[in-house]
Amino acid sequence: MGLDCYVVHGNDRDKSFTSEDDERIKDIQLCGGMFSGNGFDGSFRGKVYDPLIQELSNGEHTWYIEQEEDAFIPTDKLKEQAEMLESFFLIIIDEHGDLDDQDTVYVTNDGWAEYTLKEVHDLMTLLRVASERKAVMCVWY
């Protein structure tokens, strides 16, 4: 089942949260979907990154929400997820030192997905910036 994620303004969910809102996300490159972009425009293919979020949180967080309409991840949850990714990122850097952006740093337990250092950093940055700016993340599948 597909999952697209759209970071939007918390006070206006019809307005995408993009690099025009905060320059820190202008170089983000995440996996895009048929209806989503690559992160710098606030949208990305959530199906690719949800396994990482689920595994790092031991199942506490998921972007698949059982809600028919208006499904979104609130600001405080985005902050928790950004902090979790930051902790993971710092552990990777501490344990492995100098890594290239394209080095694989995590493979899901089932082997379905693997993530590069840059992907983890970019997802962390997007979620952190979104939470700082009080954005929310609408999810659609």
Regions found by a protein language model. Name each.
Residues 1-125, 129-133, 137-141:
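Acidic (Asp/Glu-rich) sequence patches and key acidic residues
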